[in-house]
Regions:
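Short, hinge-like loop/turn segments at secondary-structure boundaries
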Residues: 62-66, 123-126, 275-276
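Hydrophobic helix-and-loop "lid/oligomerization" segment in the mid-to-C-terminal part
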Residues: 2-18, 29-58, 74-77, 159-323
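Hydrophobic/aromatic beta-strand patches that form the interior of the parallel beta-sheet core
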Residues: 48, 81, 104-108, 120-123, ...
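Generic enzyme active-site microenvironment
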Residues: 18, 22, 82, 107, ...
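Short glycine/serine/threonine-rich phosphate/pyrophosphate-binding segments
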Residues: 25-31, 88-92
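Active-site cofactor/cluster-binding pocket
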Residues: 61-63, 69-120
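Short alpha-helices
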Residues: 108-176
Length: 323
């Protein structure tokens, strides 16, 4: 599988790398890690993301190369590689339209709900992170990892394992992290930048969640809803709403946590997390056209906040009542 992709890449001079909108650490780390590695292999590389690079990951060397998706496909582009993106729709509207008929799309991912879009697939379901998949890919190709590539892949693995707290953290994952440290990752510096420098606006958003979250089902279900206009009232931005579900998830006794966010475009965004392996939020999300992992999934649903919320909560309540 890895060898086939290597052969295809060797035939290309110019490659694009992109990932899902509202990128997390794994999306950015995977895009940058692969992009920089391909450059080291002598390729011309474009790196794109519809929403750009979140501020917390801007310290990564080369992050400025990840730019908005262009209006037109570059004339010299021969291959598009999509990383950490389980569904074509998650790439964003502009990317979908621009590359709808592109002849060579590679799908590298770790989501169990991957829809297998594209022409070439390297999909390892429920692996710790896409960055971990890429670590193994690059290692199999004999690529020498620079500090910049190692930093990017480490951020991807660390953030998608909850800083190595989740069940996906296997001995193999820890061994990979050790190899990345040996390649130059400064763990203290990376952890400080990613986890210990939170903007004041993000703390305001966390306070909002703590003040207004709802706990039900005998403490097993916790959720918070952000109505239209609330971000503007609080003076917070899009990036401040990232990872809010973790504020709810850590409450003692909670097995499922959900954040509902009115996107003000007729759609509701939902982030679902499970702390119980017997409750798959991926299965719940799939009922509403969403997907992801068993312990972490998302949904985007058209409709009113109250209606969408109740439909999803009822599905979760039903699942919890079966226990």
């Amino acid at each position: 599988m890895y060898e086939n992709l290597y052969s295809l890449i060797q035939q290309c001079g110019t490659i694009g790398v992109t990932s899902h909108f509202r990128p997390d650490g794994d999306a950015i780390g995977s895009t940058l890690g692969l992009g920089l590695a391909l450059q080291a292999m002598g390729k011309k590389v474009y790196m794109w993301n519809e929403d750009g690079v979140p501020a917390r990951y801007a310290f990564l060397e080369g992050a400025e190369q990840i730019v908005p998706v262009p209006e037109e496909i570059p004339a010299d582009l021969e291959m598009l590689i999509c990383v950490d993106t389980g569904d074509w729709k998650r790439l964003g509207d502009r990317t979908q339209k621009l590359f709808a008929d592109f002849p060579q799309i590679v799908n590298i991912d770790h989501h169990g709900t991957n829809t297998r879009y594209g022409h070439v697939h390297v999909i390892e379901p429920e692996t710790a992170a896409c960055a971990y998949v890429l670590f193994n890919v690059l290692k199999s190709w004999g690529v020498q990892l620079s500090k910049a590539v190692a930093d990017a892949l480490y951020v991807g693995i660390s953030t998608d394992t909850g800083s190595f707290q989740y069940g996906s953290t296997t001995p193999e994952v820890m061994h990979a992290a050790g190899e990345l440290l040996a390649a130059g990752v400064d763990v203290a510096d990376v952890n400080r930048r990613v986890y210990q420098e939170i903007p004041y606006s993000s703390l305001l958003m966390q306070r909002e969640v703590l003040n207004h979250m709802v706990v039900e089902c005998e403490g097993m279900l916790a959720h918070y809803s952000m109505p239209a206009g609330r971000k503007a009232e609080l003076g917070v931005g899009l990036e401040d709403t990232k990872d809010l579900v973790d504020v709810v998830r850590v409450l003692q006794g909670v097995r499922v946590a959900v954040i509902f966010e009115d996107l003000e475009d007729g759609r509701i965004r939902m982030s679902l997390r499970s702390k119980d392996p017997s409750v798959s939020v991926a299965a719940i999300a799939a009922q509403f056209g969403g997907g992801g992992h068993a312990m972490a999934s998302g949904i985007r649903m058209a409709g009113q906040l109250e209606d969408c919320r109740e439909r999803v909560l009822n599905a979760i309540r039903k699942e919890l009542s079966h226990e």
